[in-house]
Amino acid sequence: MLNIAALRQQQIPLAAEPRSPVPFHILMKPIGPACNLACRYCYYPQDETPVNKMDDARLEQFIRRYIAAQPAGAREINFVWQGGEPLLAGLSFYKKALALQARYAPDGVTISNSLQTNGTLINDAWCRLFREHGFIIGLGLEGNEALQDYHRPDKRGRSTWSAALRGIDLLHQHQVDFNLLVVVHNEMAAHAAAIYVRLVSLGARYLQFQPLMSEGAALREGYQLSADNWGRFMVGIWRQWRKRCDRGRVFVINIEQAWAQYFTHTSGSCVHSARCGSNLVMESDGQLYACDHLINTEHRLGRLDEQTLAAAVDASVQLPFGQQKSLRRECQTCSVKMVCQGGCPAHLNAAGNNRLCGGYYRFFSDILAPLRPFSRDLNGLKAWRAAFVGTAHTA
């Protein structure tokens, strides 16, 4: 049972947690890099990094202060839980988190939770928790069984495909909303159509594709996604999605976010925002970092108990990588800059260029073609929607 009174006595004194002047999110890693899988491309050096589960005192401090530091007028506060494998924290951990959220949430503010998992530990008890509290689940999966078993084995080198599919089936049975997250690497480039069909056959309505980061174990294993293969794969997904007339039935987040950004001038992804730095990461020991893919000394912002969250957000926003991500000359004259914005700073090569640039250009050029005749405002959005009602195959 969570002892709120005892936790309050352990709090580091704060006269008041000041509000951040800008919206921000913190991705929480309650068990750090701990995981039951041994993915070949994982960016965490698991053999070298100590693993510690977040204790109750730090969990309470984080939730209390994260809620208090949100900008004035915030109507929804989203908690994102990731790992490693965050389910290793245990059911009781998330029940405590939910109780704390309910205690500290101001009147009129909605609390939501998202969790990214490999799916292999999901059971009925987890699904009941997810369903009752409206969790959105992101489930990492390779494109097919052969890819999954080679690239995402368990700690003993055994297959994880069946366990992941069992988790997906349980999410369906309990009517838990989820999306499939697919890490794209060179081996997949020629098989986009088949991979798309297989993923949709699993009943997935939301798909998200993420380029493989070449860091950590990914470098040691020789992974290096090329710009050509990234573009080739994503165009293949786009064309298969159109061919099957899946608009409105299957939501490919990479496409939907770019389309929304074209008309609204705002991005739902830090990767393609005009600047980044407002999506922080906190490890189980309270260390804050500017970016999930830049967990290193250079981008370390300090501990939760060393500063206010508003100060941490301000420091993150001011880091050069966040300020200058789309200021390169080639970006300024690019015809897809409005939805690309230079991509992720973690993808820059030694010359300061995004190593996926050509792939983004090819993909965005294709998917923006149907939108070009329409003005980039809400009137254009309304006109575009009206023009393509019932003609999903042309969009």
UniProtKB/Swiss-Prot annotation:
<dbReference type="InterPro" id="IPR007197">
    <property type="entry name" value="rSAM"/>
</dbReference>
<dbReference type="GO" id="GO:0005737">
    <property type="term" value="C:cytoplasm"/>
</dbReference>
<protein>
    <recommendedName>
        <fullName>Serine-type anaerobic sulfatase-maturating enzyme</fullName>
        <ecNumber>1.1.98.7</ecNumber>
    </recommendedName>
</protein>
<keyword id="KW-0963">Cytoplasm</keyword>
<feature type="binding site">
    <location>
        <position position="344"/>
    </location>
    <ligand>
        <name>[4Fe-4S] cluster 2</name>
    </ligand>
</feature>
<feature type="binding site">
    <location>
        <position position="270"/>
    </location>
    <ligand>
        <name>[4Fe-4S] cluster 2</name>
    </ligand>
</feature>
<dbReference type="Pfam" id="PF04055">
    <property type="entry name" value="Radical_SAM"/>
</dbReference>
<feature type="domain" description="Radical SAM core">
    <location>
        <begin position="18"/>
        <end position="249"/>
    </location>
</feature>
<keyword id="KW-0560">Oxidoreductase</keyword>
<dbReference type="InterPro" id="IPR013785">
    <property type="entry name" value="Aldolase_TIM"/>
</dbReference>
<keyword id="KW-0408">Iron</keyword>
<keyword id="KW-0479">Metal-binding</keyword>
<feature type="binding site">
    <location>
        <position position="42"/>
    </location>
    <ligand>
        <name>[4Fe-4S] cluster 1</name>
    </ligand>
</feature>
<feature type="binding site">
    <location>
        <position position="39"/>
    </location>
    <ligand>
        <name>[4Fe-4S] cluster 1</name>
    </ligand>
</feature>
<keyword id="KW-0949">S-adenosyl-L-methionine</keyword>
<feature type="binding site">
    <location>
        <position position="35"/>
    </location>
    <ligand>
        <name>[4Fe-4S] cluster 1</name>
    </ligand>
</feature>
<dbReference type="InterPro" id="IPR023867">
    <property type="entry name" value="Sulphatase_maturase_rSAM"/>
</dbReference>
<dbReference type="InterPro" id="IPR023885">
    <property type="entry name" value="4Fe4S-binding_SPASM_dom"/>
</dbReference>
<dbReference type="GO" id="GO:0046872">
    <property type="term" value="F:metal ion binding"/>
</dbReference>
<dbReference type="GO" id="GO:0016491">
    <property type="term" value="F:oxidoreductase activity"/>
</dbReference>
<feature type="binding site">
    <location>
        <position position="84"/>
    </location>
    <ligand>
        <name>S-adenosyl-L-methionine</name>
    </ligand>
</feature>
<keyword id="KW-0411">Iron-sulfur</keyword>
<comment type="pathway">
    <text>Protein modification; sulfatase oxidation.</text>
</comment>
<feature type="binding site">
    <location>
        <position position="276"/>
    </location>
    <ligand>
        <name>[4Fe-4S] cluster 2</name>
    </ligand>
</feature>
<keyword id="KW-0004">4Fe-4S</keyword>
<feature type="binding site">
    <location>
        <position position="334"/>
    </location>
    <ligand>
        <name>[4Fe-4S] cluster 3</name>
    </ligand>
</feature>
<feature type="binding site">
    <location>
        <position position="41"/>
    </location>
    <ligand>
        <name>S-adenosyl-L-methionine</name>
    </ligand>
</feature>
<feature type="binding site">
    <location>
        <position position="331"/>
    </location>
    <ligand>
        <name>[4Fe-4S] cluster 3</name>
    </ligand>
</feature>
<comment type="subunit">
    <text>Monomer. Interacts with AtsA prior to its export to the periplasm. This interaction depends on the presence of AtsA 'Ser-72'. Binding of SAM to AtsB promotes the formation of a ternary AtsA-AtsB-SAM complex.</text>
</comment>
<feature type="binding site">
    <location>
        <position position="152"/>
    </location>
    <ligand>
        <name>S-adenosyl-L-methionine</name>
    </ligand>
</feature>
<feature type="active site" description="Proton acceptor">
    <location>
        <position position="292"/>
    </location>
</feature>
<comment type="similarity">
    <text>Belongs to the radical SAM superfamily. Anaerobic sulfatase-maturating enzyme family.</text>
</comment>
<dbReference type="InterPro" id="IPR047207">
    <property type="entry name" value="SPASM_anSME"/>
</dbReference>
<comment type="function">
    <text>Involved in 'Ser-type' sulfatase maturation under anaerobic conditions. Catalyzes the post-translational modification of serine ('Ser-72' in the arylsulfatase AtsA) into 3-oxoalanine (also known as C(alpha)-formylglycine (FGly)), by a free radical chemical mechanism initiated via the reductive cleavage of S-adenosyl-L-methionine (SAM). Is capable of catalyzing multiple turnovers. In vitro, use of a peptide substrate in which the target serine is changed to cysteine also gives rise to turnover, supporting approximately 4-fold the activity of that observed with the natural substrate.</text>
</comment>
<dbReference type="GO" id="GO:0051539">
    <property type="term" value="F:4 iron, 4 sulfur cluster binding"/>
</dbReference>
<feature type="binding site">
    <location>
        <position position="291"/>
    </location>
    <ligand>
        <name>[4Fe-4S] cluster 2</name>
    </ligand>
</feature>
<feature type="binding site">
    <location>
        <position position="340"/>
    </location>
    <ligand>
        <name>[4Fe-4S] cluster 3</name>
    </ligand>
</feature>
<feature type="binding site">
    <location>
        <position position="357"/>
    </location>
    <ligand>
        <name>[4Fe-4S] cluster 3</name>
    </ligand>
</feature>
